[in-house]
Amino acid sequence: MRRSQFIFITNTKETMDKRASSIIPCLALSISLFAQSNPSTIVDGKTNIAIQDSTETTKIEQIKGVVMDEQQNPIPFANIVMSSSATNTYIAGCVTAEDGSFVLPYSDKDAILKVSYVGYTTQTLACKPNMSIVLKSDVQLLNTVTIKSTRPKAKFKDGAFTTLVSGTILAELGTANDMISQLPFVSGDDGNWEIIGRGKPEIYLNGRKVEDTNELKRLSAKDILKAEIVTVPGAQYGSSTKAVIRLYAVRKRGQGLSGSLYSNYSQGHYSPQTSEHAQLNYRTGGLDIFGEVGMAYNRSHTKYHSETQLNTTNNFDYNTRRTTNYNSGKILLNTGFNYEISEQQSFGMKYETNNLIGNNYSHSWGETDVLQDDILKENLSVESFSKSKPHWSHSVNAYYNGNFGKWNINFNADYYNNVEQSSQSVLNDGILDAESNTKVKNNLYATKLVVTAPLWKGKMSFGTEEMFTNRRNTFIQSGFSADAFNHIKQSIVAGFLEYNLNIGSMNYGAGLRYEHQTTKYYEKEVLQTEQSPTYNDWIPFASIGYSHNNLNVGFSYRLNKYSPSYTMLQSSTDYISKYEYGCGDPHLKPQKQHSFMLNGNYKWVSFVAYYNYVRDMYMTWYKPYDVATHPDILLQTMATVPRSSYYGAAINAAPSFGIWQPDLTASVNFYHANLDHLNIPTMGNEPLFSFEMNNNFKLPHRWFINLSGNVSTNAKQSAGRNKCMGNVQFRVSKNFLKNDALKVMLVLRDLLHTGYYYFDANGTQSHRKLTQYSDNQEIGINVRYTFNATNSKYKGSGAGNSEKQRL
């Protein structure tokens, strides 16, 4: 009997152990195939397993390739069939992966490939070791076939909700910025997103941290392959990372010059906003050289009305009506390169700089009625001016990513530098009352190393992250408080280890992160020992998940640590008005949060439930400035709450009804904090209900309509009260030219003029109610043109991301 060996080739990187339940029938079939001496391919679920009989004298080979359209866009799920050119006998077959790639066993040198996909002309080609196949559109076939975009269904697996974007209704939403707002359990828009139960997420694009969310306004939603929402990030993420949204771009394989032009204009009742951007990418072989230039001009118009009570030596009431105009302009430049040495190794560098276009101005005016013991004491006319001066900021990232066998090494190094300079002047009844000048200089150096390797039946990740920050803050004022010269040096050194294991329908994860944080706080270059702490923290993470058929469930735990922002730590006193000052607290300690989260989905329904217990939570609060010398002045400052908790649940449903594809999210949350140590009375712990609905309509002739809205209910929670708020938006877009190269979108925001912000809270011996409206009702038009579309292959993920956010 001859000695034989069975070769298994799969189009995924998953190990066979993960699908152990299906290996036995595959082996049984392979025996019968061996008897016939014919290699074959078995489709096992979504994985194509090629089984090939190999004798000692047979040379085992395989062919690899990618299937693209005429614009170099990958075509996923195209059918690939290999057959004998002489007898037309079937040899093997598969479908392409999401990036258009495929792999098949190859032993017959005379074999041919037949490649087919709906809407494209079928091609028959001779087999080669490496193939790049371009399918041409079949115009006649497209005229008789209607291709429908379906509503993507989120699937929870391995700790993340994964939603396919490419080819779904989400790809029609214009920009990645618009698309993110419609992901499950995401609320907010324009960079101000929150994950229900977790808070503000970090955004990653192809593994690279997105520092400026305006970048997502320049990225088309059609260029996104899929989005993953990680509600409880693992140990390799910084201790302050609340949640993560990972975006993966469609990999486009075109060569030569490509680019896109983007323009946006919107007009409110008072405020215009405009931005223009141009992006270019030149690709030759494995080298990408890219660059971008962008400019933006914004004018905001805000009206607010506040009522404040302060109870000290007397009862003081302040009734303030104020209007603020803010004019800003900004320019952005970036350039860089990425070089793929091979499919296994790449490196690159990116430089980015931005600056204000001239001075940016803010002008505020209004009046305040001051009552003392219900008697009018003063009617004050207030006018203030502030100015920010232009300074270039500089950011550099360099990275290396390489695979060595089954090991992966990813290294990032970052440098960041910026200067902020501003001035303020305030007039009361036309007389100059206060002036101040502020200058801040920031420097950051950071590195991060992540090594990933297989271990037993799972995957192990370990690495280090280092961050070194230097910040100087100079504050000079005209006499209402004291000058300040603060200098902060901080270093954070971290190491982490994480392991993920899949066994049958179960998956397990565990990780541990260690952080050593040292802070040196100087006032006038004199070290302040009490304000220069050293912290050593262990940050654990654990998760467990179950997947079977349409049901996916996971439970996770993580400890988060949040260091106060540098603004929170400032000791200088800012002049807000004649009767209100503001300052930070350099004695703030890091906030620690224990998070427990249950996630899951069944078919098109997803759900989350969460509980968070927080130690030393940061809180903005109001108290008397100085009862003895200034009993009528209110101070806005920072405090920590020793113990607090918030918890709740949410459900998301995304069915599909023909051209109408709705998406509904309903949530409830509770918040409790004991504020007795601050002498702040609480109002209650009522449930806060929120509802959000997106209605998407995919119409003929490349038209698309979106109508979305949200509303939250009244609720008294802890020391504050939430008032019922809501918003409605409308979008309509149409694609033009071949391959939808031109997209025009009309946007109507805050249709019902309900986008108000309300604030109602108790303070120490004080209470404040605020109503604010920022000219949100507006009409806008977005135009995007793309040519020879390719995406940069830059894979730098950045280091020191948490410190960049603090700066």
Q: What residues fall within each predicted segment?
A:
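Short, acidic, small-residue-rich periplasmic hinge/interaction motif at the N-terminus
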Residues: 37-56, 68, 81-83, 114-120, ...
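Short, acidic Ser/Thr/Gly-rich low-complexity loop/linker segments typical of extracellular
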Residues: 86-101
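Short acidic/polar hinge/loop motifs at secondary-structure boundaries
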Residues: 103-105, 182, 208-234
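N-terminal periplasmic accessory domains that precede
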Residues: 129-136, 144, 176-179, 214, ...
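Surface-exposed extracellular loop regions of Gram-negative outer-membrane beta-barrel proteins
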Residues: 248-263, 303, 307, 319, ...
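Face-selective signature of the C-terminal outer-membrane beta-barrel domain
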Residues: 332-358, 380-524, 545-552, 606-609, ...
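Outer-membrane beta-barrel signature, preferentially recognizing the C-terminal barrel domain
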Residues: 385, 487-490, 530-533, 561-615, ...
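Outer membrane beta-barrel strand-and-loop segments of large Gram-negative receptors
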Residues: 444-448, 492-494, 583, 589, ...
